[in-house]
């Protein structure tokens, strides 16, 4: 894309688009690492900084060796695994354990409570604050007010306070921001251009249309299964945890125990490695062709460009690991800023404006007579 810009508008425009291209790749990779590290820490207890630094190595190893071909092959395989996990979760929520009627009834009961009823039912005064993943004082859990956050009562800005309406003020605003903001991000993201150029011309347009339809199934299915199940079951997931994308692991762990945690980790790793590989290839392409060959060595051979690409993949992975750790250490708000784009996994949680979460709610319980692994094997 940057080469097209240089040929049409010259050096100044080329450098401008090159800068925004790098920014887009860094932002997307940051969201992958920060969201992935938060989930890994919540489910396994691995140190957040360590997880953020180690995750890129799964991308570096095969991307630097296989290049764009390895990225395409791995993405296809990873997508199959992701869809398998999504189908399992939807089947569990709406067929195996609950039904659409039950989930609807639970949600209707949740939004029927008034604020006074919610406070009376879910008051935790004088008790230890506990969320789904953590326990501690209100300050330690990030609860800024004396009253814990809770998922109870009607949703402000939604028609009739429902979680199931399309008439949502917050949802409309999110849609506008997402379309406007992510359109620019996609336009300057080299990974999309590489996929289009690598495909046959007659297959590129059809491929992107079908790919968009297939992608839509993932956030839509996760939001309407794990997202709504979290609200229906009133799981003790705090607002900050929901914003960090921890709703799916909470629901999966609640329904399947360790088996659910393993499935979410597998799905998460597949998504991170697949997208991270594409972003790494995009950065290496920008550096090799738009920086090295354009401004440093115009007479570069194919072998030299390949060597530069592989070096950049390794260096970019190391840089992003350190970048994620530094932001996590230096400013916890960066995670919230990044995740508010809902770009990592918009289906992993409902929109943040719909959450009013309590940190200590356990209303509905699942009968524990059948182990989670037996339930999963029976489903399969």
For each feature predicted by the language model, list its residue ranges.
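Membrane-embedded helix-loop-helix hairpins and adjacent transmembrane boundary segments
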Residues: 1-380
């Amino acid at each position: 894309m940057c080469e097209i810009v240089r040929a049409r508008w010259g050096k100044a425009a080329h450098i401008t688009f090159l800068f925004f291209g790098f920014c887009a790749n860094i932002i997307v990779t940051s969201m992958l690492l920060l969201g992935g590290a938060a989930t890994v820490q919540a489910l396994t207890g691995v140190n957040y900084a360590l997880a953020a630094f180690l995750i890129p190595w799964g991308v570096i190893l095969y991307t630097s060796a296989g290049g764009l071909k390895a990225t395409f092959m791995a993405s296809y395989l990873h997508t199959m695994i992701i869809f398998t996990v999504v189908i399992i979760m939807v089947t569990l929520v709406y067929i195996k354990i609950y039904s659409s009627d039950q989930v609807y009834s639970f949600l209707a009961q949740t939004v029927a409570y008034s604020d006074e009823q919610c406070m009376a039912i879910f008051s935790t005064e004088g008790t230890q604050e506990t969320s789904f993943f953590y326990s501690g004082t209100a300050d330690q859990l990030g609860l800024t007010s004396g009253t814990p956050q809770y998922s109870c009562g009607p949703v402000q800005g939604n028609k009739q306070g429902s979680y199931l309406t399309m008439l949502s003020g917050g949802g409309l605003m999110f849609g506008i921001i997402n379309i406007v903001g992510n359109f620019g991000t996609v336009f300057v993201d080299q990974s999309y251009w590489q996929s289009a150029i690598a495909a046959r011309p007659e297959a590129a347009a059809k491929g992107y249309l079908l790919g968009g339809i297939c992608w839509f199934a993932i956030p839509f299915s996760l939001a309407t299964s794990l997202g709504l199940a979290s609200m229906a079951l009133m799981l003790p997931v705090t607002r900050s945890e929901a914003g960090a994308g921890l709703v799916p692991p909470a629901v999966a762990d609640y329904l399947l125990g360790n088996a659910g945690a393993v499935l979410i980790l597998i799905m998460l790793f597949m998504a991170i490695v697949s997208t991270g590989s594409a972003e790494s290839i995009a950065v290496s392409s920008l550096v090799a062709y738009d920086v090295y060959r354009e401004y440093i060595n115009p007479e570069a051979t194919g072998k030299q460009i390949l060597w530069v690409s592989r070096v950049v993949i390794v260096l970019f992975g190391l840089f992003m690991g350190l970048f994620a750790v530094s932001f996590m250490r230096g400013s916890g708000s960066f995670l919230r800023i990044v995740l508010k784009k809902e770009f990592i996994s918009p289906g992993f949680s409902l929109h943040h404006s719909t959450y009013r979460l309590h940190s200590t709610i356990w209303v509905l319980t699942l009968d524990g007579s059948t182990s989670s692994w037996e339930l999963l094997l029976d489903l399969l």
